[in-house]
Amino acid sequence: MKKISYVVVLISLTHYASASSEINFSPDSVSVDASLSVLNGKSSEFVYNDGDKLSQLDWKIQNTPIVKAGITWDAISWLTLNASGWTTLASAGALMDDYDWLEPEQHHWSEWSHHPATRLNFANQFDLNMTGWFLKDENYQLGAMLGYQETRFSWGATGGHYSYNNGNITGDFPRGQKVIGYQQKFSAPYLGLAGKYIYRDFDIIAQFKYSPWAEGKDTDQHYLRDITFKEKVINQKYYSAVINVGYNITPQARVFTEMSWSRTSNDIGDSTYYDNAEGEVEKMKDSAGMQNYNYTIGAGIQYRF
């Protein structure tokens, strides 16, 4: 009798594993979503010498409209694949402040320039991930995520005013004069957790992502001096959280509001200096740093075929 029970259990488990691993090609296994959001945040770049900070440039993002889109495939009962991204719709107003510490033993900056006519030229992101659901019920789901993400930002600062030599030299840059251009790119393979709770026609989706392997690259173009810095930082820490609250207006259509937050923390990396006029190149170890945080708030619609 015991042998028969074991055989029945084994057959049942084998059948469940086979069924649960069957690839789902039905149309209702695929959903698409689109939303409009507002992006805010700040990127910073740093210059170091023997561990001392010489320069910090803060590039702010202010209420920039973006469009988000994504496609999701419930490929297997326990596995979901997703591709998503967002991009700015057009260039937008931004802000840049440039601080330098040129006086030895002085903790407060000695040089500062302010550029209210800065523009965010573009920003975008793409994200590829998969979620394996280890808890799945009619009202809740919990899973582990594995993914890869890239995020890019580009700014240009023109005009503005300056205060040098501890305020002894002040003035204005000509209106419209190109001062500094800056591009930043972060890439990160990541791990994460995903969860979903369903109550009648409402649901809440939450995601948390983490990576200790983020990599930052940037290009800093100083137009007035005709010099360029290119920097690279590895093994940065990346954190991200998303909350999505939705309502199913039909079995196929869902409207939602969403808030996301992400941060890539500063770390020390290397820099390459280019004197474009003289053709000189110099590589500098442990001389650069960069970081970014940003958040979005928006609303959209999801459709399941």
Outline where the language-model segments fall.
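Sec-dependent signal peptide recognition
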Residues: 2-9
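Extracellular/periplasm-exposed beta-strand and loop segments of Gram-negative cell-envelope proteins
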Residues: 41-64, 87-126, 150-186, 211-242, ...
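Transmembrane beta-barrel strands of outer-membrane/channel proteins
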Residues: 32-40, 83-89, 132, 144-152, ...
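Repeated loop/turn-to-beta-strand initiation elements of outer-membrane beta-barrel proteins
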Residues: 77-83, 137-140, 201-204, 251-257
